[in-house]
Amino acid sequence: MRLLVSNDDGVYAPGIKALAEALKTIAHVDVVAPDRNCSAASNSLTLTNPLRINRLDNGYIAVNGTPSDCVHIAIREICTEEPELVVSGINAGANMGDDTLYSGTVAAAMEGRFQGLPAIAVSLSARTPVHYDAAAQIALRIVEGLKAHPLPADQILNVNVPDLPLEEIKGIKVTRLGARHRAEGVVRTTDPAGREIFWLGPPGEELDASEGTDFGAVAEGYVSITPLTVDLTAHSQLNALANWIEKI
């Protein structure tokens, strides 16, 4: 089995090392990741600057681009054989609810799907996570399960793991995305030269963390697995929209 591993925290992050080392026990693993932290890069691609790669001593490849760049260039140019699965992570921090739209971790998995490959994104739910090895073992089990149960062509799996020792994780729940309140306001301040600068405020508090959501599962000590679709169409609204838009 051949796997491509990437992330958005960067090629030097502890999460990608833990993930790659665990997966190497069952597969050939290529690691291609950003040369710096690219959190919240979403699905952005680099179109106005050239991409360069740097082959590190440990065999990993660093790219001066976004997570989506890394997966795209890895599949198209770097991997000597096409991988069978893309695994993104392990992210330092959860990617649940609305966060998935901003997440570079989820975006790397989505890029794998755009390139025709099944993919999963793995995140460790804590501000300063500790138990990367536990999350890596969960990822390993999911990858092994996917051998017998391949993903549909239009889906990825978004996996969020509570930051607990493996033996304290209660189990796995299949969930839907929860939701957050609006993000907190922008912070306006000045730099040392007196020039005005802005910092984006932190994400809003959880709005929907009810039973069945990713937020709810992780809060209870369970791994959350949410199947995400690439199709963003609001299918339930098509007829209602057509009824009035045709009269314009």
Curated annotation (Swiss-Prot):
Listed GO CC annotations: cytoplasm
Main location: cytoplasm
Residues that coordinate or bind a divalent metal cation: D8, D9, S39, N91
Catalytic activity: a ribonucleoside 5'-phosphate + H2O = a ribonucleoside + phosphate
Superkingdom to which the source organism belongs: Bacteria
PANTHER family the record matches: 5'-NUCLEOTIDASE SURE, 5'_3'-NUCLEOTIDASE SURE
Name of the protein this chain belongs to: 5'-nucleotidase SurE
Native source organism of the sequence: Shewanella amazonensis (strain ATCC BAA-1098 / SB2B)
Lineage: Bacteria, Pseudomonadati, Pseudomonadota, Gammaproteobacteria, Alteromonadales
